[in-house]
């Protein structure tokens, strides 16, 4: 209905203004890290739920850099992949997982007309990935299920998420496994095809990313951590209850065509 559309536009304008403007007289500032993607958008939407706190969002492209910034004290909370969070905790690093961020969003993409028709055809091929991410774990699981040894039967090439499309279109790699909207973009722009969605009921599953804080931050400021988690929950629920608002906001914030996000939406899930 026109009324609902107008209300959504008004709310979208309000959220965008809050995300871009940091009040100078706020009692406290939350420094939060995340990626500039639709499936990790929640921190950009905390402001209406922050009870007067200023929210400064720091976008990253690599989960390792996010964790390093958190441990250095530059961030109060940050998104990261669950693989990296588990790895960090196993090493005794002082991080605490306080919320989920997103579940599924991954896809295995191959070069169009590159001759790869099945995962088994990736033997000897160059595959782009980001180490220490859930995408790496899902890639390794997918190759193993097809009878390939990830370390011997394929050449895994470290490439930043946002460089994968260019590398595939140029022929520098034969495939990559990454999150949306890159797989959908590759398909729509004609240089790639989605070979598989790497989710298997009896395997790793659709887990992907979460929010972490430093242990000392939890111990010293437990109430602030709870406030941040509440804002995270409300931002997540807002997006999941209003899919149009979520995708329209992501499109405007991150410069991704709305139709691309609509095509990718079934492969993205926000959680808290």
What are these model-derived regions, one by one?
Residues 1-6:
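Short, Lys/Arg-enriched N-terminal segments with co-localized hydrophobic residues
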Residues 13-23:
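Bacterial N-terminal signal peptides
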Residues 186:
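Short helix- or helix-capping micro-motifs
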Residues 80, 178, 213, 220, ...:
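A conserved hydrophobic position in a structured secondary element of the catalytic/binding core
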Residues 219-272:
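Secondary-structure end/capping motifs
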Residues 28-151, 155-161, 167-170, 174-180, ...:
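Short, glycine-/small- and polar/acidic-enriched structural segments
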Residues 101-110, 192-218, 225, 229, ...:
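Periplasmic-binding protein-like
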């Amino acid at each position: 209905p026109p009324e609902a559309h107008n209300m959504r536009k008004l709310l979208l304008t309000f959220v965008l203004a809050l995300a871009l403007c940091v009040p100078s007289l706020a009692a406290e500032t939350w420094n939060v890290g995340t990626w500039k993607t639709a499936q990790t958008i929640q921190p950009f939407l905390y402001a209406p739920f922050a009870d007067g706190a200023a929210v400064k969002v720091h976008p990253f492209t690599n989960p390792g850099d996010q964790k390093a910034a958190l441990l250095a004290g530059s961030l109060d909370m940050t998104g990261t992949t669950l693989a990296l969070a588990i790895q960090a905790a196993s090493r005794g690093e002082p991080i605490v997982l306080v919320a989920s961020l997103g579940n599924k969003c991954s896809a295995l993409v191959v070069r169009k007309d590159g001759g790869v028709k099945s995962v088994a055809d990736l033997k000897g091929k160059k595959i782009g990935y980001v180490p220490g991410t859930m995408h790496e774990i899902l890639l390794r699981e997918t190759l193993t299920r097809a009878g390939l040894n990830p370390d011997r039967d394929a050449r895994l090439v470290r490439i930043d998420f946002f460089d994968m499309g260019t590398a595939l279109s140029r022929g520098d790699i034969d495939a990559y496994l990454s999150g949306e909207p890159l797989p959908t973009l590759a398909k729509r722009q004609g240089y790639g095809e989605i070979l598989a969605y790497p989710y298997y009921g009896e395997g790793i599953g659709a887990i992907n990313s979460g929010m972490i804080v430093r242990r000392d931050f939890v111990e010293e400021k437990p109430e602030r951590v709870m406030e941040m988690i509440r804002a995270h929950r409300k931002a997540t629920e807002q997006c999941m209850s209003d899919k149009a608002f979520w995708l329209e906001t992501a499109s405007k914030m991150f410069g991704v065509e709305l139709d691309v996000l609509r095509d990718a939406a079934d492969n993205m899930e926000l959680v808290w």
